[in-house]
C-alpha cells in the first residue's frame, strides 16, 4: 500500500532507547552481586573479541544518574533496561540481595523523576552461574519456579512504578547461540538439547506472565523476539518452500508459542521424525496457554533471504564477529533451507542486511497473524564510530534510524498498533561477541578493548537528531 498522507505517530508514542545489564553496568562483583554465566563464559579464551567482558563495561552502575540526565536532555519518553538476576539473587534463589534491589529502585526513581517511562526486562541472558552449576539452567524444569520467584520479587518491588515489562529477551537468538553455534553459554552444539531447553524457557515465560496478572494487574508484559522476517531468493517454487520452512522454523516456532501457546504443526512433525522434538509433559500446554502477552516485543535488525538447500547441503557457516565486511558465510539446515545474500540490499560491516521496508513487512505479518500490539524493543546500527574534532559525525546511523522510523510510520498507516520504539542503544556498550568496537549508541563512551580509559560520555550527532524527532513526535523525519 502506498499512503499519500501517512498517519502521524500516536500522541503518547513511547520514543525510547534500550540497554542490557551485563553490557552496561559493570560492578560485576560489587555490593553482593553473584556471578552470571557470562562472568564465567567470557573468561574462556577465544570466546569473545579480544577477551572482552562486562566486569566494568561502561560503568553504568556508578554513573546511572549521569546517563539518565543525558536521557532527559534528549527527551526520551521510555528507557528499556534489564535487571541482573544474580544482582538480586546472587545464587539465583534463596536469600535476596537488598543492595541489588536498591540499585534498581534508584534507577527507576531517577527515570520517573525525569518523566521517562521505565521498561523493565526480566531476563537478558545473565543467568546466575549458581543455577547453571546446580542443575544446568534452562535444561532443568527447576528453573521454572526459580525464575517465577525472581519475577514475583520484582513485581512486588517495582510493580507500583513500572508499567511495561519484558519477560525473556531474544530467547531464539540466545538459545541458538547457546546450543547450536556454541557462541553463548553453555557453549554446546546439540539440537535435541536446544529444543528441550527452549521448551522449558517457554514454560518459564508463561509462568512469569501468569504471575504478572496477579501482581501487576494494570501493567503490560510481553517477550522480546529477535525477528528477522524471511524472504525467498526467487519465485522458484523450491525457494518459496525454503522460505516457508524458514518462517516456520526461525520465526513462527517462537511467535506462535508466545501468542497462541502452541507449536506450528509442520516443523513439530519434522522434529519428531528427527528425534529433536521437545518433551511435552502433562500440564505443559495448559500453562503455555496462559502465557498470552499484552504485546509482541520486536528486536529488528535485518531480514534474511533463503533458498533451497539439498540434503547434502550447507550446515552451520561462520558468523562475522570482526566487522570485516564479506566474511559472513551461508548457513542452513540440510534439506530445509539455507541463507543467501540478497542482491537488492546493502549490508553493514558485520554483514547484516539494511532493510527498512523489511521492518514494515515484519510488523504487518505479526499484526495480521496475532492481532496484538507491537513494541519495537530494539533497532539500531552497530558501526566503527570515530571521534573527530571532538564529536562523532554518525550520519550513517541517522540515515539508518530515519529510514526505519519512516517505515514504522507507514506500518501505523497500514493498521499496525505500534506502542513505541526503543533504539539500540542509548550509550555505547559491550557487544557480547564483538567487544567495544561495534558501537550502537547516541552517546559515545570513551573506552575500547585494551583500556577503559576515562569512560567519558560524548553526545554524537545522532543524539541531537533523535532529540528533534522526539520533540516533534516524528514530524521532523
Swiss-Prot record:
Is able to catalyze the hydrolysis of aryl-phospho-beta-D-glucosides such as 4-methylumbelliferyl-phospho-beta-D-glucopyranoside (MUG-P), phosphoarbutin and phosphosalicin. Is not essential for growth on arbutin and salicin as the sole carbon source. GO terms for molecular function: 6-phospho-beta-glucosidase activity; beta-glucosidase activity. The keyword Amino-acid biosynthesis does not apply. GO terms for biological process: carbohydrate catabolic process. Its EC number is 3.2.1.86. The active site is at 170 (proton donor), 378 (nucleophile). GO terms for cellular component: cytosol. Belongs to the glycosyl hydrolase 1 family. It comes from the Bacteria. InterPro entries: Glyco_hydro_1, Glyco_hydro_1_AS, Glyco_hydro_1_N_CS, Glycoside_hydrolase_SF. Induction: Is not induced by aryl-beta-D-glucosides such as arbutin, salicin or 4-methylumbelliferyl-beta-D-glucopyranoside (MUG). Is not repressed by glucose. The keyword Magnesium does not apply. Pfam families: Glyco_hydro_1. It catalyses: 6-phospho-beta-D-glucosyl-(1->4)-D-glucose + H2O = D-glucose 6-phosphate + D-glucose. This is Aryl-phospho-beta-D-glucosidase BglC. Keywords: Carbohydrate metabolism, Glycosidase, Hydrolase. Gene3D superfamilies: Glycosidases.
Amino acid at each position: 500500500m502506498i499512503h499519500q498522507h501517512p498517519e502521524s505517530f500516536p500522541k503518547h508514542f513511547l520514543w525510547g532507547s534500550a540497554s542490557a545489564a551485563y553490557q552496561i553496568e559493570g560492578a560485576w562483583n560489587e555490593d553482593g552481586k553473584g556471578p552470571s554465566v557470562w562472568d564465567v563464559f567470557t573468561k574462556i579464551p577465544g570466546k569473545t573479541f579480544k577477551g572482552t567482558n562486562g566486569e566494568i563495561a561502561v560503568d553504568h552502575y556508578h554513573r546511572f544518574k549521569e546517563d539518565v540526565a543525558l536521557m532527559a536532555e534528549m527527551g526520551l519518553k521510555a528507557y528499556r533496561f534489564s535487571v541482573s538476576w544474580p544482582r538480586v539473587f546472587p545464587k539465583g534463589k534463596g536469600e535476596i540481595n537488598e543492595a541489588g534491589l536498591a540499585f534498581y529502585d534508584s534507577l527507576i526513581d531517577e527515570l520517573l523523576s525525569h518523566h521517562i517511562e521505565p521498561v523493565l526486562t526480566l531476563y537478558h541472558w545473565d543467568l546466575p552461574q549458581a543455577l547453571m552449576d546446580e542443575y544446568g539452567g534452562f535444561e532443568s524444569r527447576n528453573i521454572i519456579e526459580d525464575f517465577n520467584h525472581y519475577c514475583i520479587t520484582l513485581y512486588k518491588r517495582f510493580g507500583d512504578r513500572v508499567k511495561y515489562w519484558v519477560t525473556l529477551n531474544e530467547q531464539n537468538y540466545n538459545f541458538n547461540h547457546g546450543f547450536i553455534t556454541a557462541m553463548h553459554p553453555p557453549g554446546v552444539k546439540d539440537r535435541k538439547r536446544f529444543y528441550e531447553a527452549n521448551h522449558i524457557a517457554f514454560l518459564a515465560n508463561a509462568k512469569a506472565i501468569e504471575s504478572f496478572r496477579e501482581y501487576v494487574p494494570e501493567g503490560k508484559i510481553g517477550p522480546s523476539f529477535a525477528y528477522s522476517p524471511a524472504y525467498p531468493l526467487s519465485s522458484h517454487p523450491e525457494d518459496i518452500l525454503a522460505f516457508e520452512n524458514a518462517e516456520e522454523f526461525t520465526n513462527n516456532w517462537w511467535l506462535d508459542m508466545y501468542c497462541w501457546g502452541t507449536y506450528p504443526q509442520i516443523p513439530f512433525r519434522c522434529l519428531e521424525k528427527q528425534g529433536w522434538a521437545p518433551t511435552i509433559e502433562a500440564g505443559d500446554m495448559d500453562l503455555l496457554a496462559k502465557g498470552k502477552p499484552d504485546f509482541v516485543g520486536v528486536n529488528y535488525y535485518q531480514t534474511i533471504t533463503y533458498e533451497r538447500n539439498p540434503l547434502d547441503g550447507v550446515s552451520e557457516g561462520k558468523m562475522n564477529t570482526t566487522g570485516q565486511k564479506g566474511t559472513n558465510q551461508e548457513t542452513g539446515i540440510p534439506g530445509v533451507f539455507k541463507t543467501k545474500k540478497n542482491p537488492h540490499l546493502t549490508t553493514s560491516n558485520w554483514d547484516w542486511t539494511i532493510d527498512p521496508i523489511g521492518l514494515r513487512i515484519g510488523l504487518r505479518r505479526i499484526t495480521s497473524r496475532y492481532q496484538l500490539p507491537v513494541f519495537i524493543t530494539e533497532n539500531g546500527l552497530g558501526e566503527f564510530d570515530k571521534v573527530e574534532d571532538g564529536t562523532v559525525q554518525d550520519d550513517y546511523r541517522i540515515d539508518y534510524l530515519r529510514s526505519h522510523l519512516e517505515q514504522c510510520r507507514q506500518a501505523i498507516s497500514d493498521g499496525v498498533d505500534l506502542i513505541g520504539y526503543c533504539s539500540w542503544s542509548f550509550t555505547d556498550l559491550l557487544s557480547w561477541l564483538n567487544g567495544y568496537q561495534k558501537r550502537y549508541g547516541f552517546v559515545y563512551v570513551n573506552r575500547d578493548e585494551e583500556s577503559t580509559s576515562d569512560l567519558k560520555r560524548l553526545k554524537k550527532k545522532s543524539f541531537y537528531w533523535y532529540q528533534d524527532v522526539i520533540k516533534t513526535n516524528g514530524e521532523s523525519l
